[in-house]
Structures are given as structure tokens and as C-alpha cells.
Amino acid sequence: EAAFVRQMNLRARALGLTQTHFANPHGLDSGENYSTALDLAHLAQAALQNAQLRAVVSTKTAVCAGRTLTNHNKLLWRYDGCIGVKTGYTRHAGRILVSAAERDGRMLIAVTISDPDDWRDHAALLDYGFAVLGSDTPAYPQNRRIVWKNDCKKFWRAVQMSRAAKRR
């Protein structure tokens, strides 16, 4: 396990995840695991390039040894184009949701930490992102990361705008 965790941390550094450290392979509370929403978004972008992982996280149900396993990611069921990624909760970290969706060849990633309404907020963020970026002409060069970097006012304004648009 220790060798695997070393490899995880080396890969994190290679991906430029400067605010991430792994202490175990499963991510459960240890006091030594940490990351940021930005690093988790970068990690998701890299991970989704792996076709097998992408297939697993986007699977809604699977039958294994006669049992039906159901993915807990509600966005897979509710959000058009959702790829999935990571749901989770630990006592120390709280609720963390990393989701991605793809439409018209454009993929967006949303990350929230300790958001009590994360499913709805992710849908709102993704809706806002697809609306702002459009689908005809890329607004930014391909593969450029667009990040709001701690601009909470802009984040919540985007969520509120998307929620208001859905009510109309």
C-alpha cells in the first residue's frame, strides 16, 4: 500500500496538483489526505482521459455476481450528458462531489466541497457553463482551463442565474 501511495503522490506532482497529498489509496479520513477543488478538477480532467475509468464512472447500473449495483451519482440519472466522476462523504472532509458533463464535444467539470445542495448546484454550474461557452465556436483555446479561483460571488451568481432561468 505504501508503494502505491508513493506512486499516487508522484503522479499528483506530475499533474501539477500542488495542493494535494495522498496518505492512503481509498481517500478515507487519515488526517494526512488533503486536496483543493481546483486540484480535484485537474485530477478529474486527467482521469477522464482513461477510457476504462470513464466507462466505469459513467455506468448507471451493473450486475456483478448476480447483484445489481447502482451508481449513487444522481446526475447520471438527471443531467443530460453527465459522465459522472466522484461522489463521497467522510466526517473530516464532508461532502465532496466532482462531476463532469459533455455536450457537443465540450466537457465541463464541476467540483464542490461541503455543499448541502451539491446535486442541484452542479446542474446549475454545468448549465451556466454550457450556456456561457456555447457550442458553435470555442470561446477559449482548446484544453485551456477556465477557473473562477475562489471568486465566490461569481460562483453563486452563476448558480442563481441558472436556477432563475430554469424557473422561467
Predicted regions and their residues:
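Glycine-centered helix-coil hinge/cap
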Residues: 1-2, 90
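Domain-terminus/edge residues, biased toward the C-terminal soluble/receptor-binding domains
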Residues: 14-21, 29-168
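Short, charged, amphipathic alpha-helices and their helix-cap/turn boundaries
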Residues: 2-20
